Every structure is written in C-alpha cells, then in structure tokens.
Regions:
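N-terminal capping/small domains of soluble enzymes
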Residues: 2-103, 108-109
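Conserved small/polar residues in nucleotide/adenosyl-binding loops
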Residues: 178-180
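Catalytic beta/alpha-barrel core
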Residues: 135, 147-154, 169-176
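Conserved radical SAM core fold
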Residues: 55-60, 136-145
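Active-site-adjacent beta->alpha loops and helix N-cap segments on the catalytic face
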Residues: 89, 141-162, 166
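Non-membrane alpha-helical structural segments and their capping/turn regions in soluble enzymes
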Residues: 82-86, 112, 116, 149-156
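Residues at the N-termini of beta-strands
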Residues: 48, 130-131
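Short, electropositive alpha-helical surface patch
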Residues: 103-128
Length: 180
C-alpha cells in the first residue's frame, strides 16, 4: 500500500441468491425500522437492516419498563410493539426505495395463517425487500401459548408454507432451547 492510499477489503457475502455488501447487519428489535436515527449511522453502509417485527395488526407492546439494566447486561421485553403490516407497507416500503442497503423484514405471528397472510401481503407489493426473518420465538396462541420454535413439527410446517410463497431469502429466527 502506498502512503496516502487506502485499499478497502471486499467484505461481500452471499446468502441464497442475495449478495450483501458486507456482513454488518443490525438485528431485529435493535434498530427499529432502520430509519429512526440517521444521525447515528449511515444505513447505506450496512450490509442489511433486519427490521423490528411486523404483525398483522398494530401492537402497543408491553407496558414499561420494557428494558432493565442488570450487572451482566440488559433484559428487554418489548412485546412486539409495531405499526402493523398495512401501515408498514404504506409508510416504510417507500422509504426503503431510497436506500442501497438490503432490507430483511422480520415477521411475527400468533398462528401459521397470520405468518402466511403477512408474507402474502408483502410479496404482493414489494420489490425492495431482500428477504424475511421469521420470528418463531413468538407464542403460538392456537397451541396454548407455546412458542413455535419449541415444536419442531410446527416449525417445519410453517417453514414449508412460507417457502412456497417467496423466492426471497428466508431466515428462521430460532429461540434458544438451552437453559443456563
């Protein structure tokens, strides 16, 4: 390298058919919808934004306190607060058309049908979405509040139903089954 000239490494990664400019992604729930704090980071320098969860209907989430600091870190229980899929499509998708970074939409549901309906709505309107992260750590109301990710058969059924709806990247957000 000559003095005064810097060479940037190629950090591109490929997942499925999508090529991301780098492996730096913001995780779902940590960065809102990716547009809330432009003064903090130029989102176009990120590999991807994984949005906060989207549900069929808007949700207020859990009452405060939602975040608690502990000596070992932080615990959060947001409760999937979000604007709902219709408002998301109306308000957020047009904003993403002006970004160069990839958008991964996190989808949450209470049963298989809700996940299917949300993905069908997204697929019918959006060309700016690179893929989906399917939040299966949500309680499955039709199974008595059990989380999808604890039931391998339900996880398989959900994955199969969603895979046929899209050719985009499909990421299953698994929950930890390890008890410490």
């Amino acid at each position: 390298m000559k003095r005064g000239i810097s060479v940037l490494a190629n950090l591109k990664i490929t997942m499925g058919s999508e090529v991301f400019q780098n492996p730096i992604w913001v995780a779902s729930g940590t960065f809102g919808y990716g547009t809330e704090a432009p003064e903090l980071v130029d989102v176009n320098r990120l590999g991807a934004i994984v949005t906060k969860s989207i549900t069929r209907k808007p949700r207020e989430g859990n009452p405060p306190p939602r975040i608690v600091e502990t000596p070992s870190g932080m615990i959060n229980s947001i409760g999937l607060a979000n604007i709902g899929v219709k408002k998301y499509i109306q308000d957020m998708l047009p904003v993403y058309e002006n970004l160069t970074t990839k958008i991964i939409v996190n989808i949450a549901g209470t049963d298989v049908q809700e996940y299917v309906e949300i993905m069908e709505m997204m697929e019918s309107v959006s060309s700016v979405i690179a893929g989906y992260e399917i939040n299966i750590s949500c309680p499955n109301v039709k199974k008595g509040g059990m989380e999808f990710g604890v039931d391998c058969d339900m996880t398989e059924k959900l994955t199969e139903k969603l895979r046929v709806l899209t050719e985009r990247l499909l990421i299953m957000k698994l929950l930890s089954l390890i008890h410490i």
